[in-house]
């Protein structure tokens, strides 16, 4: 970077001739026209190259409720034109007005347009800082805001005497805020379309005392106390007071989200006080809200076989004493069942161990009996009678051969027996013949 600075401090014609091959040959695009006219030091070549790589402006946000204040016409009117006769003249701005204008300048399209370099702008001529892709946009935005604030202060000084002291209800900027709100009401979405349920009953102004309001006073007090004790802040009223400055679109969206979430909590916490009011005052039962009671039941009903993931973490304080006792008894029963479940696995483990032990004993007995039978078979075979280390396969083979040989000897002996029987029969018959001949 120091090389570029020293390089730019030399003669401009020689420098441009030396770095001319680095630029595009385009006659329509002249980077240094403004510098040549004003006879200022030219920027480094990298400065204009980074212009081609600047990021596009961010997408626009939701339409602000004060769209009139964001427009350049309103800014010019508010800063340079005098107010009406009722305001006391002068374009003076309070601290809230300046902060609001700064926030809208930072979030609006004027700053986004400032990121794109305009060669006819004064800031392009005076900008001698070597730009960087990270810091050039922020410096331009800060410079634009400071220039706008300086113009506002100059307009305030030139406008004349400051406006007289304003009371809490006579702020002209607040009247302009309300006028802008009414003018931009067509651009905004009706909250009743997004939130069909009543958002905040406690924020509405309380009417005169009536029997209906007296009947529901405990529930409203309990709602207020629960809203104050809740970790989240209570929802702000929708009606803007005169001294409250209008919020931006992002703030309004966050307030709507908080109001929606707190509305769900208030519907859940509204059920026990309503029951108490119905049981305590039977006369007010006819004036109870019929459309809201089924809604509360539908939103608070949770099936027993499902887990309510959207429920608050601790719901024990919402239940009465009877339900607490039932919950405690149910927890005790669950603990007992869990203990039984814990005991039953132990008993099943012992049973499995006993079965395994008896199986091992029976298997050992079977192996011992099989070994004894093999030893007995080995003793019956003449070839393996004295061989104590004979394997079982050899014992089985030798036993099979010995049995076959024994069966063959048996058949031979049976045939010899038959021959001897026949011989005996023949000899007996011959002896009988000799006895008969001698007689």
UniProtKB/Swiss-Prot annotation:
<keyword id="KW-0804">Transcription</keyword>
<dbReference type="GO" id="GO:0006879">
    <property type="term" value="P:intracellular iron ion homeostasis"/>
</dbReference>
<feature type="modified residue" description="N6-acetyllysine; by PCAF">
    <location>
        <position position="323"/>
    </location>
</feature>
<protein>
    <recommendedName>
        <fullName>Myc proto-oncogene protein</fullName>
    </recommendedName>
</protein>
<feature type="modified residue" description="Phosphoserine">
    <location>
        <position position="293"/>
    </location>
</feature>
<dbReference type="GO" id="GO:0005737">
    <property type="term" value="C:cytoplasm"/>
</dbReference>
<keyword id="KW-0656">Proto-oncogene</keyword>
<feature type="compositionally biased region" description="Acidic residues">
    <location>
        <begin position="251"/>
        <end position="263"/>
    </location>
</feature>
<feature type="short sequence motif" description="UBR5-degron">
    <location>
        <begin position="355"/>
        <end position="364"/>
    </location>
</feature>
<dbReference type="GO" id="GO:0045893">
    <property type="term" value="P:positive regulation of DNA-templated transcription"/>
</dbReference>
<keyword id="KW-0963">Cytoplasm</keyword>
<feature type="modified residue" description="N6-acetyllysine; alternate">
    <location>
        <position position="148"/>
    </location>
</feature>
<feature type="modified residue" description="Phosphoserine">
    <location>
        <position position="348"/>
    </location>
</feature>
<feature type="modified residue" description="N6-acetyllysine; by PCAF">
    <location>
        <position position="275"/>
    </location>
</feature>
<keyword id="KW-0158">Chromosome</keyword>
<feature type="short sequence motif" description="9aaTAD">
    <location>
        <begin position="100"/>
        <end position="108"/>
    </location>
</feature>
<dbReference type="GO" id="GO:0005654">
    <property type="term" value="C:nucleoplasm"/>
</dbReference>
<dbReference type="InterPro" id="IPR002418">
    <property type="entry name" value="Tscrpt_reg_Myc"/>
</dbReference>
<keyword id="KW-1017">Isopeptide bond</keyword>
<dbReference type="InterPro" id="IPR012682">
    <property type="entry name" value="Tscrpt_reg_Myc_N"/>
</dbReference>
<dbReference type="GO" id="GO:0006974">
    <property type="term" value="P:DNA damage response"/>
</dbReference>
<feature type="modified residue" description="N6-acetyllysine; by PCAF; alternate">
    <location>
        <position position="143"/>
    </location>
</feature>
<keyword id="KW-0325">Glycoprotein</keyword>
<dbReference type="GO" id="GO:0043066">
    <property type="term" value="P:negative regulation of apoptotic process"/>
</dbReference>
<feature type="modified residue" description="N6-acetyllysine; by PCAF">
    <location>
        <position position="317"/>
    </location>
</feature>
<comment type="function">
    <text>Transcription factor that binds DNA in a non-specific manner, yet also specifically recognizes the core sequence 5'-CAC[GA]TG-3'. Activates the transcription of growth-related genes. Binds to the VEGFA promoter, promoting VEGFA production and subsequent sprouting angiogenesis. Regulator of somatic reprogramming, controls self-renewal of embryonic stem cells. Functions with TAF6L to activate target gene expression through RNA polymerase II pause release.</text>
</comment>
<dbReference type="GO" id="GO:0000082">
    <property type="term" value="P:G1/S transition of mitotic cell cycle"/>
</dbReference>
<dbReference type="GO" id="GO:0032873">
    <property type="term" value="P:negative regulation of stress-activated MAPK cascade"/>
</dbReference>
<feature type="cross-link" description="Glycyl lysine isopeptide (Lys-Gly) (interchain with G-Cter in SUMO2); alternate">
    <location>
        <position position="143"/>
    </location>
</feature>
<comment type="subunit">
    <text>Efficient DNA binding requires dimerization with another bHLH protein. Binds DNA as a heterodimer with MAX. Interacts with TAF1C and SPAG9. Interacts with PARP10. Interacts with KDM5A and KDM5B. Interacts (when phosphorylated at Thr-58 and Ser-62) with FBXW7. Interacts with PIM2. Interacts with RIOX1. The heterodimer MYC:MAX interacts with ABI1; the interaction may enhance MYC:MAX transcriptional activity. Interacts with TRIM6. Interacts with NPM1; the binary complex is recruited to the promoter of MYC target genes and enhances their transcription.</text>
</comment>
<dbReference type="GO" id="GO:0051782">
    <property type="term" value="P:negative regulation of cell division"/>
</dbReference>
<feature type="modified residue" description="Phosphoserine">
    <location>
        <position position="161"/>
    </location>
</feature>
<keyword id="KW-0238">DNA-binding</keyword>
<dbReference type="InterPro" id="IPR050433">
    <property type="entry name" value="Myc_transcription_factors"/>
</dbReference>
<dbReference type="GO" id="GO:0045944">
    <property type="term" value="P:positive regulation of transcription by RNA polymerase II"/>
</dbReference>
<keyword id="KW-0597">Phosphoprotein</keyword>
<feature type="modified residue" description="Phosphoserine; by PIM2; in vitro">
    <location>
        <position position="329"/>
    </location>
</feature>
<dbReference type="InterPro" id="IPR011598">
    <property type="entry name" value="bHLH_dom"/>
</dbReference>
<feature type="domain" description="bHLH">
    <location>
        <begin position="354"/>
        <end position="406"/>
    </location>
</feature>
<feature type="modified residue" description="N6-acetyllysine; by PCAF">
    <location>
        <position position="371"/>
    </location>
</feature>
<dbReference type="GO" id="GO:0009410">
    <property type="term" value="P:response to xenobiotic stimulus"/>
</dbReference>
<dbReference type="InterPro" id="IPR036638">
    <property type="entry name" value="HLH_DNA-bd_sf"/>
</dbReference>
């Amino acid at each position: 970077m120091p090389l570029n600075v020293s390089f730019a401090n030399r003669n401009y014609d020689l420098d441009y001739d030396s770095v001319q091959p680095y630029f595009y040959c385009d006659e329509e695009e002249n980077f240094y026209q403004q510098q040549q006219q004003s006879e200022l030091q030219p920027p480094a070549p990298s400065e204009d190259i980074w212009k081609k790589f600047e990021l596009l402006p961010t997408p626009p946000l939701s339409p602000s409720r004060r769209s009139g204040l964001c427009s350049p016409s309103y800014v010019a009117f508010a800063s340079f034109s005098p107010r009406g006769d009722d305001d006391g003249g002068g374009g003076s701005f309070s601290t809230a007005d300046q902060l609001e204008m700064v926030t809208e300048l930072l979030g609006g399209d004027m700053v986004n347009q400032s990121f794109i370099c305009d060669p006819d702008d004064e800031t392009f001529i005076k900008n001698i800082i070597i730009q960087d892709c990270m810091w050039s946009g922020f410096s331009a935005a800060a410079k634009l805001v400071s220039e706008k604030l300086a113009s506002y202060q100059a307009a305030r000084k030139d406008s004349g005497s400051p406006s007289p002291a304003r009371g809490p209800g006579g702020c002209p900027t607040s009247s302009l805020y309300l006028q802008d709100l009414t003018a931009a009401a067509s651009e905004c979405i009706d909250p009743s379309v997004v939130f069909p349920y009543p958002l905040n009953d406690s924020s509405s102004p309380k009417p005169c005392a009536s029997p209906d309001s007296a009947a529901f006073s405990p529930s409203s007090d309990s709602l207020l106390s629960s809203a104050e004790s809740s970790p989240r802040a209570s929802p702000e009223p929708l009606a803007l007071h005169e001294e409250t400055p209008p919020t931006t679109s992002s703030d309004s969206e966050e307030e709507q989200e908080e109001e929606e979430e707190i509305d769900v909590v208030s519907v859940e916490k509204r059920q026990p006080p309503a029951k108490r009011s119905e049981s305590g005052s039977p006369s007010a039962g006819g004036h109870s809200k019929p459309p809201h009671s089924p809604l509360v039941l539908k939103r608070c009903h949770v099936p027993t076989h499902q887990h309510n993931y959207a429920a608050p973490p601790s719901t024990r304080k919402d239940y009465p004493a009877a339900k607490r006792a039932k919950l405690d008894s149910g927890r005790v029963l669950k603990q007992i069942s869990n203990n039984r479940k814990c005991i039953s696995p132990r008993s099943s483990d012992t049973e499995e161990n006993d079965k395994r032990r008896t199986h091992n004993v029976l298997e050992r007995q079977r192996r011992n009996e099989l070994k004894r039978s093999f030893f007995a078979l080995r003793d019956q075979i003449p070839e393996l009678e004295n061989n104590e280390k004979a394997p079982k396969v050899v014992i089985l083979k030798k036993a099979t051969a010995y049995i076959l040989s024994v069966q063959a000897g048996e058949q031979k002996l049976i045939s010899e027996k038959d021959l001897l029987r026949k011989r005996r029969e023949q000899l007996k018959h011959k002896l009988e013949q000799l006895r008969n001949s001698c007689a």
